[in-house]
């Protein structure tokens, strides 16, 4: 839908109707402070809230990283989505009539919006159907399973809207398509039915299964998890990916857990649906689960938004598979873990039990579980404990293996204080109770860390571009354009410098962006732009006209690094200009050198001397500009 041309009246109505506090509040825990609202910034990692939302201005700003803008900017940056996608979602949310500039596109837009709304409706009706069927005679086996095997109360069954999918091949199909008259294509897109491979017709995706609705963070049903009640494989089966459901971005139970996570300032991540349900029933409601896939960074960051301390506790099974799952989860979010951006703890329950088994095995286990949560070791301590399992440090091979594992953990710790603490701890462990050996073991580990930190011949620099000059120029132009887009107060300075120095952008996609900026400023008379509408209007210009937006899309998004560049714009502008000025001088120097090679200094002495002087002048300018650039090198 990115090529849809939205009518300016539609965009203006959306801007007038939206409530930025309500929108951002879906993703960030906000607390009222005076006239504004404060929370943890979702665009960079912080422990103290510096993210401010102003309902009066309908703007947000982070004093930590400099991210700021309106509701459009927030949703575009957070979800890495296009302006059109965000505008359409907001229009749907606030029930705003969409106007486009082409009737055919308007029809396609209405079809897309109608389909999404229809999918939500179909999923809600299906959830109600499964839940109702659970209490019918055909659902008795499933209800008995929940009562006797899972020990769940009627209130919990109602709260999670658990249900039963009948054993028939076309039961849900007939209900949704033939009785409720939903289009068969929409029901198929919802992941509830499948087309038969041979012949015609459809059959139900879920049959003779216990059904568990999966909801988004707003509480809308977007998919189903299921457990077989017979011998069918697989034992657990989820909905396929659909327009509503993306497994790697969804956490089961987050809609019901988010308030508790905010209240107790921690989140517990378990393996299965019934672990979540059992813990919620026991009053431990800050619990969610991944959906049978490797944990993703997106899932962890969605949890972090609801906890100011960013404390997450992994409670996977304590068997070998669970230990491996914990290790994989740590690896998946390694940048967050090793840098300390998430306070991760690991809880393994006694006797290898999962949370559901543990809670239901004894009446006292609810209190015991809560105690174990408080005592759960930090992930580093847990990793060290895993290294020591079934190892005899008096055995040279075991000792060497443990020491290597410790070095591997320590070298990834970016916080020097944390590294020093665990370096001492590991030294004490390896000394095996002999205090005289502690300093020796610490020094030994430290020397390996120092050696390991040295870059090799093909070390961390292998990623650098093959053409550093071209790469540097592109970065400089991109930085200047980003400052121009996001810093209205710097635009007169940049305009003046570019005009006085007769500078042009060298890359085609940058020239096109500059052309669109110029057109938008002239059309909308943006000589003064206190609300910084330029980025939004330029993106709209790309959507309404031809142009490769992908090549410049990153310039409209603010990261922690780029926010720092904008904060230091007065230093970054001269640096970028210096690089851009170098290019024509380098070109002129090459021109002079070519002329010198063609001239005979004996017969063409005057011309030879002229180009020799010009070459030297260009060389001096290049040296001056390079020195100016190196004072504030581009990252």
Curated annotation (Swiss-Prot):
<dbReference type="GO" id="GO:0006269">
    <property type="term" value="P:DNA replication, synthesis of primer"/>
</dbReference>
<keyword id="KW-0479">Metal-binding</keyword>
<dbReference type="GO" id="GO:0003677">
    <property type="term" value="F:DNA binding"/>
</dbReference>
<feature type="zinc finger region" description="CHC2-type">
    <location>
        <begin position="41"/>
        <end position="65"/>
    </location>
</feature>
<keyword id="KW-0548">Nucleotidyltransferase</keyword>
<dbReference type="Pfam" id="PF08275">
    <property type="entry name" value="DNAG_N"/>
</dbReference>
<dbReference type="InterPro" id="IPR019475">
    <property type="entry name" value="DNA_primase_DnaB-bd"/>
</dbReference>
<dbReference type="GO" id="GO:0003899">
    <property type="term" value="F:DNA-directed RNA polymerase activity"/>
</dbReference>
<protein>
    <recommendedName>
        <fullName>DNA primase</fullName>
        <ecNumber>2.7.7.101</ecNumber>
    </recommendedName>
</protein>
<keyword id="KW-0238">DNA-binding</keyword>
<dbReference type="InterPro" id="IPR002694">
    <property type="entry name" value="Znf_CHC2"/>
</dbReference>
<dbReference type="InterPro" id="IPR006295">
    <property type="entry name" value="DNA_primase_DnaG"/>
</dbReference>
<dbReference type="InterPro" id="IPR006171">
    <property type="entry name" value="TOPRIM_dom"/>
</dbReference>
<dbReference type="GO" id="GO:1990077">
    <property type="term" value="C:primosome complex"/>
</dbReference>
<feature type="binding site">
    <location>
        <position position="271"/>
    </location>
    <ligand>
        <name>Mg(2+) 1</name>
    </ligand>
</feature>
<comment type="similarity">
    <text>Belongs to the DnaG primase family.</text>
</comment>
<dbReference type="InterPro" id="IPR037068">
    <property type="entry name" value="DNA_primase_core_N_sf"/>
</dbReference>
<feature type="binding site">
    <location>
        <position position="317"/>
    </location>
    <ligand>
        <name>Mg(2+) 1</name>
    </ligand>
</feature>
<keyword id="KW-0863">Zinc-finger</keyword>
<dbReference type="GO" id="GO:0000428">
    <property type="term" value="C:DNA-directed RNA polymerase complex"/>
</dbReference>
<comment type="function">
    <text>RNA polymerase that catalyzes the synthesis of short RNA molecules used as primers for DNA polymerase during DNA replication.</text>
</comment>
<dbReference type="GO" id="GO:0008270">
    <property type="term" value="F:zinc ion binding"/>
</dbReference>
<dbReference type="GO" id="GO:0005737">
    <property type="term" value="C:cytoplasm"/>
</dbReference>
<dbReference type="InterPro" id="IPR034151">
    <property type="entry name" value="TOPRIM_DnaG_bac"/>
</dbReference>
<keyword id="KW-0862">Zinc</keyword>
<feature type="domain" description="Toprim">
    <location>
        <begin position="265"/>
        <end position="348"/>
    </location>
</feature>
<dbReference type="InterPro" id="IPR050219">
    <property type="entry name" value="DnaG_primase"/>
</dbReference>
<dbReference type="InterPro" id="IPR036977">
    <property type="entry name" value="DNA_primase_Znf_CHC2"/>
</dbReference>
<keyword id="KW-0639">Primosome</keyword>
<dbReference type="Pfam" id="PF13155">
    <property type="entry name" value="Toprim_2"/>
</dbReference>
<keyword id="KW-0808">Transferase</keyword>
<comment type="subunit">
    <text>Monomer. Interacts with DnaB.</text>
</comment>
<feature type="binding site">
    <location>
        <position position="319"/>
    </location>
    <ligand>
        <name>Mg(2+) 2</name>
    </ligand>
</feature>
<dbReference type="Pfam" id="PF10410">
    <property type="entry name" value="DnaB_bind"/>
</dbReference>
<keyword id="KW-0240">DNA-directed RNA polymerase</keyword>
<dbReference type="InterPro" id="IPR030846">
    <property type="entry name" value="DnaG_bac"/>
</dbReference>
<keyword id="KW-0804">Transcription</keyword>
<keyword id="KW-0460">Magnesium</keyword>
<dbReference type="InterPro" id="IPR013264">
    <property type="entry name" value="DNAG_N"/>
</dbReference>
<feature type="binding site">
    <location>
        <position position="317"/>
    </location>
    <ligand>
        <name>Mg(2+) 2</name>
    </ligand>
</feature>
<dbReference type="Pfam" id="PF01807">
    <property type="entry name" value="Zn_ribbon_DnaG"/>
</dbReference>
<keyword id="KW-0235">DNA replication</keyword>
């Amino acid at each position: 839908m990115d090529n849809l041309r939205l009518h300016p009246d539609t965009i203006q109505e959306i801007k007038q109707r939206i409530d930025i506090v309500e929108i951002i509040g879906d993703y960030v825990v906000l607390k009222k402070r005076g006239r504004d609202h404060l929370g943890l910034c979702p665009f960079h990692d912080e422990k103290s809230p510096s993210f401010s939302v102003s309902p009066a201005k309908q703007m947000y700003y982070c004093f930590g990283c400099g991210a700021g803008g309106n509701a459009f900017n927030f949703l575009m940056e957070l979800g890495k989505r296009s302006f059109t996608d965000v505008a359409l979602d907001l229009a749907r949310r606030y029930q705003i009539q969409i106007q486009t500039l082409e009737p055919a596109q308007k029809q396609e837009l209405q079809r897309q919006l109608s389909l999404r709304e229809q999918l939500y409706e179909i999923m809600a009706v299906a959830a109600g159907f499964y839940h109702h069927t659970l209490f019918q005679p055909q659902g008795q086996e499933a209800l008995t399973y929940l009562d006797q095997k899972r020990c769940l109360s009627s209130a919990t069954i109602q709260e999670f809207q658990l249900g039963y999918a009948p054993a028939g091949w076309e039961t849900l199909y007939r209900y949704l398509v033939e009785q409720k008259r939903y289009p068969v294509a929409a029901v198929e897109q919802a992941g509830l039915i499948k087309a038969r491979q041979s012949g015609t017709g459809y059959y139900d995706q879920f049959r003779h299964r216990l059904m568990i609705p999966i909801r988004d963070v707003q509480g809308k049903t977007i998919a189903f998890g299921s457990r077989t009640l017979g011998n069918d494989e697989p034992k657990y089966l989820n909905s396929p990916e659909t327009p509503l459901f993306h497994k790697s971005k969804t956490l089961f139970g987050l809609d019901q857990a988010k308030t508790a996570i905010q209240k107790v300032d921690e989140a517990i991540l378990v393996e299965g649906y019934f672990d979540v349900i059992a813990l919620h029933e026991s009053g431990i409601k800050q619990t969610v689960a991944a959906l049978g896939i490797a944990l993703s960074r997106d899932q962890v960051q969605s949890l972090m938004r609801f906890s100011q301390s960013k404390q997450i506790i992994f409670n996977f099974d304590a068997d070998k598979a669970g230990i491996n799952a914990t290790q994989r989860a740590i690896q998946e979010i390694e940048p967050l873990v090793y840098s300390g951006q998430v306070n991760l703890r690991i809880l393994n329950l006694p006797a290898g039990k999962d949370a559901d088994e543990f809670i239901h095995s004894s009446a006292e286990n609810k209190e015991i579980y809560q105690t174990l949560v408080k005592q759960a070791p930090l992930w580093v301590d847990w990793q060290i404990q895993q290294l020591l399992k079934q190892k005899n440090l008096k055995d040279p091979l075991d000792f060497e293996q443990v020491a290597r594992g410790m070095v591997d953990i320590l070298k990834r710790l970016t916080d020097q204080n944390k590294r020093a603490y665990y370096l001492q701890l590991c030294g004490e462990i390896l000394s095996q109770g002999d205090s005289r050996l502690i300093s020796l073991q610490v020094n030994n580990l430290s020397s390996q860390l120092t050696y390991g930190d040295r870059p090799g011949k093909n070390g961390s620099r292998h990623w650098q571009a093959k053409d550093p000059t071209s790469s540097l120029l592109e970065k400089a132009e991109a930085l200047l354009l980003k400052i121009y887009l996001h810093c209205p107060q710097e635009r007169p300075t940049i305009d003046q410098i570019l005009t006085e120095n007769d500078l042009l952008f060298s890359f085609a996609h940058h020239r096109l962006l500059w052309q669109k900026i110029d057109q938008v400023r002239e059309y909308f008379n943006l000589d003064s732009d206190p609300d910084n509408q330029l980025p939004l209007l330029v993106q709209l210009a790309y959507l309404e006209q031809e142009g490769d937006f992908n090549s410049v899309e990153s310039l409209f998004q603010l990261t922690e690094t780029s926010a720092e560049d904008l904060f230091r714009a007065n230093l970054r502008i001269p640096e970028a200009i210096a690089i851009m000025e170098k290019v024509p001088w380098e070109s002129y120097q090459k021109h002079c050198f070519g002329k010198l090679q063609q001239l005979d200094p004996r017969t063409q002495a005057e011309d030879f001397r002229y180009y020799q002087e010009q070459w030297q002048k260009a060389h001096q300018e290049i040296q001056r500009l390079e020195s100016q650039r190196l004072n504030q090198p581009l990252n």
